[in-house]
Structure formats: structure tokens, C-alpha cells
């Protein structure tokens, strides 16, 4: 029985995701510059020609990895896609972020190892900011300006630095953090950044 267009699309999406996952692992552990398209294709168990049907270059593949991470983050913060962050969505975001951190430690660890490589940082600085990213930044600014008009950008910087710093500690050494401690810290951050209390 021939496959339907939907089935072909599902297969294609599956292979695309496989390539992204394999590339992230190799970029993180071998280095972006030291990893070749041939190595990615071999580990993904496909030919270079097939891989090039999905990604035209290694840089395009890197962009897909970064874009996937940003998209996943924004689905957490604006699930109804209305470009407005409500208080409820902001509180839910912390639950989703911490759940993702605890359930995807290897992927998040690989992502950190990738994005802190000098050559990757250079590529990010040279033009990976898109209109979509600017829209997301504006959403955060609007959310925090309602709470602290004078310090909205500082609040955003503090939030991003806090989440990145803690998640890095967690994914590289999760054995040092009990579930009780992580949950308590999550609620503390909700209080500080969303509810406006320090308790």
C-alpha cells in the first residue's frame, strides 16, 4: 500500500530531527569546526547526498539547532501564540522550563557545550538574530515593563542569566540537586520575577 503525503512528511520530519540530534551531539563533543558533514551522515546512518537534501551546509544545520532551541523556549512562554505573555503563562513557563531541564539534561548539556565554542559564538554574533527573535524580545520587554517600567531590561537580563546559570549547574552535575531543592528554587524564582515577592 503506497504511503500518504502525510506519512512521507512524517518520515521526512523524523529524518530531519535525527540529523539535528546527531549534529548537536557531535558538535558538542567533537567541536563544531572539527565535525564534518560526512561524520554526521555516518552517525545518522545515511548518505551525504541524502543529508544534503535536508541541509545545504553545516552552518545551516547549526542555525537549525539554534532555531529549534529558541522555538521550544518560546512555545513554553507563549503557548497560545498571541504575542502576549500573561501572568499565568509566565508562571507556567517556570514549570515547563524546569521540567525540560530535568528530563532533557543530555540535550541541554550538549547545547551549552555547543554555544560556548568560540567559533559558534562568532557565528551567532554575525547574524543569527532574526525578526522572530526581536519579536520574542519585545514580548519580554512588554511583560516586565508593566511591573517595573524603569528596570524592564535589567529584569530580563537578570532572569536570563539566572535561568542559564542554574540550568548549566544542573545539567553538568544533577546529582548535587535534590528534587525538593529544585522545586523550592523554582517557586522562589516565580515569587521574585512574577509574583513580586522574595519569599
Functional labels for PLM-detected ranges:
Residues 89, 100-127, 171-175:
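Amphipathic alpha-helical segments used for helix-helix packing
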Residues 64, 78-105, 146, 156-159, ...:
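Hydrophobic alpha-helical connector segments
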Residues 67-73:
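Short, basic, alpha-helical segments at the C-terminal edge of helix-turn-helix-like DNA-binding modules
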Residues 79, 103, 120-147, 153-157, ...:
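Amphipathic alpha-helical packing segments from all-alpha helical-bundle domains
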Residues 1-2, 99, 134-150, 172-199:
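C-terminal peripheral helix-coil segments that are non-catalytic and often amphipathic
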Residues 15, 19-27, 97, 163:
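Short hydrophobic clusters on alpha-helical segments that form packing/core surfaces
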Amino acid at each position: 500500500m503506497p504511503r500518504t503525503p502525510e506519512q512521507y512528511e512524517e518520515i521526512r520530519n523524523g529524518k530531519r530531527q535525527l540529523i539535528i540530534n546527531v549534529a548537536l551531539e557531535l558538535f558538542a563533543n567533537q567541536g563544531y569546526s572539527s565535525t564534518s558533514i560526512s561524520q554526521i551522515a555516518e552517525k545518522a546512518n545515511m548518505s551525504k547526498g541524502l543529508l544534503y537534501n535536508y541541509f545545504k551546509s553545516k552552518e545551516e544545520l547549526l542555525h537549525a539547532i539554534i532555531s529549534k532551541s529558541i522555538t521550544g523556549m518560546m512555545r513554553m512562554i507563549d503557548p497560545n501564540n498571541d504575542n502576549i505573555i500573561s501572568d499565568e503563562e509566565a508562571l507556567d513557563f517556570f514549570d515547563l522550563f524546569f521540567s525540560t531541564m530535568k528530563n532533557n539534561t543530555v540535550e541541554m548539556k550538549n547545547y551549552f557545550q555547543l554555544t560556548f565554542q568560540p567559533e559558534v559564538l562568532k557565528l551567532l554574533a554575525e547574524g543569527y538574530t532574526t525578526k522572530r527573535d526581536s519579536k520574542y524580545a519585545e514580548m519580554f520587554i512588554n511583560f516586565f515593563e508593566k511591573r517595573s517600567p524603569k528596570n524592564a531590561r535589567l529584569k530580563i537580563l537578570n532572569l536570563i542569566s539566572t535561568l542559564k546559570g542554574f540550568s548549566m549547574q544542573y545539567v553538568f552535575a544533577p546529582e548535587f540537586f535534590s528534587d525538593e531543592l529544585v522545586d523550592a528554587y523554582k517557586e522562589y524564582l516565580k515569587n521574585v520575577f512574577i509574583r513580586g515577592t522574595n519569599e
